[in-house]
Amino acid sequence: MADRSLHLVVLILLGTALCAAQPRGRILRGQEAPSHSRPYMASVQVNGKHVCGGFLIAEQWVMSAAHCLEDVADGKVQVLLGAHSLSQPEPSKRLYDVLRVVPHPGSRTETIDHDLLLLQLSEKAVLGPAVQLLPWQREDRDVAAGTLCDVAGWGVVSHTGRKPDRLQHLLLPVLDRATCNLRTYHDGTITERMMCAESNRRDTCKGDSGGPLVCGSVAEGVVTSGSRICGNHKKPGIYTRLASYVAWIDGVMAEGAAA
């Protein structure tokens, strides 16, 4: 009996370690999006490899998450627009160089607060059916709990680390902040600058970070992840609320236009 108990403990600890080591950044239990159905989506790339999502908010500006490029020192940052497949030739695809990388000044590696990043493209994006701007929320109000919102990305889709070549998406219901702040969930760490969505085995995380949480055709939030394990219903997905940063976003883009 003692040997069996010890064996069970070892299995539990091993399972816990494996879960902790599994890659964050996956759209879990999503599905492939219809081709070019989300023409605002951007692939933020470093040295030619996808690292995060993003979305086009102005002809020369892409929104993403600050922690996406925290560990990038000398890498070449570029943005791919007009893509459904990351690897296959598509007439609409174009890779843009980045002129400026502007993380929110309050962003820090040890926290997910202020987790926003603006990327100024070296030239204006060529708009068309597969490349479009996404309106973003400027009115400072909370999205009603239960509202179904869309998230999309190219993050890994399984615990084995398999990466999709084509854009994936899923719908997630918004969770009210009070519930998200319960001790059993995020224990009071969710500020008014953040919002949550349910994550019961369906979720997005770091590999999809920077992509938009789209509610009613408007970007309400930006995907962030922190250190949580994705797909855990006790750790709802966390998103940066764009409406809390209108002045900063407008100011950065105005400064870029004047440069």
UniProtKB/Swiss-Prot annotation:
Residues 27-254 form the Peptidase S1 domain. Disulfide bonds join C52-C68, C149-C215, C180-C196, C205-C230. Residues 224-228 are annotated as: Self-inhibitor loop. Gene3D superfamilies: Trypsin-like serine proteases. It is found in: Secreted. Residues 22-26 form a propeptide. CFD is activated by the removal of 5 residues at the N-terminus, named activation peptide, by the MASP-3 isoform of MASP1. Residues 1-21 form the signal peptide. GO terms for molecular function: serine-type endopeptidase activity. Circulates in plasma in a mature but self-inhibited form. Activated by factor B (CFB), which displaces the self-inhibition loop. Associates with CFB complexed with complement C3b. CDD domains: Tryp_SPc. Keywords: Complement alternate pathway, Disulfide bond, Hydrolase, Immunity, Innate immunity, Protease, Secreted, Serine protease, Signal, Zymogen. It holds the Pfam family Trypsin. Its EC number is 3.4.21.46. The active site is at H67 (charge relay system), D115 (charge relay system), S209 (charge relay system). One of its GO terms (cellular component) is extracellular space. The record marks R26, I27 as: Cleavage. Serine protease that initiates the alternative pathway of the complement system, a cascade of proteins that leads to phagocytosis and breakdown of pathogens and signaling that strengthens the adaptive immune system. In contrast to other complement pathways (classical, lectin and GZMK) that are directly activated by pathogens or antigen-antibody complexes, the alternative complement pathway is initiated by the spontaneous hydrolysis of complement C3. PANTHER family: COMPLEMENT FACTOR D, KALLIKREIN-RELATED. The self-inhibition loop inihibits the serine protease activity in absence of factor B (CFB) substrate. Belongs to the peptidase S1 family. This is Complement factor D. It comes from Bos taurus.
